[in-house]
Amino acid sequence: MTGMRDQTQKVPPDAEIIARQWALTQTTITDICSTNIATRLPRNANLPFLVMFRAGGNLMNPRSDAHIQNALLPMECYAGRWGGSGNDKPFADYSTATSLANAVIQAAFNYSNGYITTSDSNTRAKIYSFEIVQFPTRIEEVSTGLGRYSIALAMTYRAV
């Protein structure tokens, strides 16, 4: 049939799930933040903490039968101490926040053509590569008082 695509191609799984699982497999990242990686920063979370979310993306080649996506993943790296009542003031640890940001960038720069499988849902994907879209940018975090650096990656991946 003319104009039909390969119907066996699966849509890639949620980029946030795959990117988080990838980060959990990178010791350069987990040596700094352990498993403190999610799509939002919980109040009073253990720190340091890596927050990531999908902010769009595109098909690598809209005319191809292969469903390969390029997902844009902004990330926030937090470190320090939460403030509390009384004299317990928040503490912004910019050194650890930038170390976490640089660890993510280093891991992404070194990674290519790997397979990721989530432990809880057995979701699988192939990550072809990461592109570093934004290098560490210091953010003055007024609301939390924590150290914060912002970075962004683009992840090229597909379902398997």
Residue ranges and their predicted role:
Residues 35-46:
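Short acidic low-complexity segments
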Residues 1-33, 53-160:
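Charged, amphipathic alpha-helical segments and their flanking helix caps
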Residues 45-55:
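Charged, often glycine-rich, active-site loop that binds/positions anionic groups
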